[in-house]
Amino acid sequence: MATLSSPTIITTTSILLNNPFLPKTPQLSAHHHRGVRSVNGKVSCQTKNNNGNDENNQFQLIQNPNTNTPYLLDRRNILLGLGGMYAALGSEGANYYNTLAAPILPDVEKCTLSDALWDGSVGDHCCPPPFDLNITKDFEFKNYHNHVKKVRRPAHKAYEDQEWLNDYKRAIAIMKSLPMSDPRSHMQQARVHCAYCDGSYPVLGHNDTRLEVHASWLFPSFHRWYLYFYERILGKLINKPDFALPYWNWDHRDGMRIPEIFKEMDSPLFDPNRNTNHLDKMMNLSFVSDEEGSDVNEDDQYEENILLMRKAMVYPSVSDDPNKAELFLGSPYRAGDKMEGDVSGAGILERMPHNSVHVWTRSNTIKGNQDMGAFWSAGRDPLFYCHHSNVDRMWSLWTDVLHGGNFPKTPEYDDYRNAYFYFYDENANPVRVYVRDSFDTERLGYKYEDQELPWMSITQQQQQQQRQQQRQPLLGGRLKTRTFSLVKKVLTELKVMLPLPLKYSVIKTKVDRPKKSRTKEDKLEHEEVLVINFKLGKSKDFIKFDVYINDGTDYKPEDKTKINLEYAGSFTSLTHGGGGGGGDMSHMAEEDMGKNTVLKLALNQLLEDLDATDDDSIQVTIVPKSGTDSIVITGIDIE
């Protein structure tokens, strides 16, 4: 690893299982809550095995004999005898993790109230109706088989099938009319997202750690399952089991607007808590606020949108690096990790354009970033599910179309595969679903209608032309035209000392590369990754900063994000609610309020585009855009 010299470098990727997993006394205590049982020493759930037989699934506490650290294990994940298990405790790598599998498990018996808004003016809680774990069944494909494969189609083509559109409106209307006691009702479905995304559930065995499915490798799978059951509920309500959700096709020019079917004010698909300035406007997939870039014409905006999509989808897919799945899907998140400090960060799929679309859609007049701009309220807008249908489509495209190589499509750790969530199905029955069963949309019974992918066909010549049009570096106080080689030479001479606050100033610094002039084989096997470590404090605003490589532009925070050839990516984060019970954050340590976070960006293809593969170093530019007052950059490395 090449490291930028810094007095303080904070490493944030804590994937080793060396955190205190449980109190030193190996005893769990679940207090009597909402009529469910109390347990000590083990957590027992009655489930069904693959043959439909009852199975007493017990989580047991054991200790690593090398470290005396206790771990919570699911017996079904241990395929070794007792002697083999203890021998494996001293091993390293994936076998170590898989033997001591520590997946994230929600403690749904302890759902807590939360303040929805930061100032507490609107109180709400995120707890769906409680259920008895003793009667909860595990998901089995045979019990949710579809006789006809569902086809999700672009929302902007909805008027071509009036029968389907009428069914969609009727299903949403019925869902909204269901009583709050029904877990399938519109508000209760929205609360599912709030509960898993705003810290209402503690992690099983870790009462001081709140579960959060964003900013980790859980993000894609959770939302796929969420839409899966939401879609089945809608079909059940109108007695059409083959009903399929639409997808908001924001990666295609025809879909880069809020779909018309969601703008009819008398429709159940309408939500008043949207940005009224954007109802008929082409989307900006790198959006921050209406104040920046309002004068950009549609053709230029479209070109930037598809270049952003290419950088988000194609650039991370050009090598066979075994860690590629985590780079795209999100960083590891294991039991014992605290989202306030141990979880590294969101994957490419979540950061852009997912987060920007949320912010583009949220209300511009109502406080609290409602509805789409905050985790606690996003599920209240029917457009949310259409948006996430396209996010899910991006995952499918990355897996089935862009994959093409030998790297794993998903992380291979049992910590990831054996994590689970609870949902209500179309019959209002609770069901437990595992991450490992979410990978194949064909088995889940749905697919996406094919649509042109304009971001797949951008040519090198088009990118070079865009670079020439956009390059106007400000050097020596005067605007001059420079050749790319001269600009690169000047830029890479500067190096800054960290840590540095990002509050209002742009950070430009030289970063040494660990290896230059890499062979084709080396680049195929290993992705060069830019790693930006930073402290992230609380913010009431959408958080965003942009990153550029070898760019001579004199950027200012108020400038519109320029999606040019040098653009490497952005860090983004939506607004959270209070969590933790009435906004009580006492379960968090003081030092955790500024959490260690990391942004990882793929460099292989970008360095090729910039003719920088033979350089000893690169220049990194970090531009604050929104909510960065509490961000401190602590380290910039290449690995």
From Swiss-Prot:
It is found in: Plastid, Chloroplast thylakoid lumen. GO terms for molecular function: catechol oxidase activity; metal ion binding. There is a cross-link at residues 197-214 (2'-(S-cysteinyl)-histidine (Cys-His)). Cu cation B binds at residues 354, 358, 388. GO terms for biological process: pigment biosynthetic process. Cu cation A binds at residues 193, 214, 223. Its main location: plastid. Its cofactor is Cu(2+). PANTHER family: SHKT DOMAIN-CONTAINING PROTEIN (PTHR11474:SF76), TYROSINASE FAMILY MEMBER (PTHR11474). Belongs to the tyrosinase family. This is Polyphenol oxidase, chloroplastic.
